[in-house]
């Protein structure tokens, strides 16, 4: 996924950022959101 697809038309992030890392977006999975940098996971 290209970097520009993370942002909406206003230039703001469409996805949530990691609460641990702060500078990493969480990957969207069917049943969870996951940070690939630190391993943080939020279950839906």
UniProtKB/Swiss-Prot annotation:
Zn(2+) binds at residues 18, 21, 35, 38. A zinc finger (C4-type) spans 18-38. GO terms for cellular component: ribonucleoprotein complex; ribosome. It holds the Pfam family Ribosomal_S27. It comes from the Archaea. Its cofactor is Zn(2+). GO terms for biological process: translation. GO terms for molecular function: structural constituent of ribosome; zinc ion binding. Belongs to the eukaryotic ribosomal protein eS31 family. This is Small ribosomal subunit protein eS31.
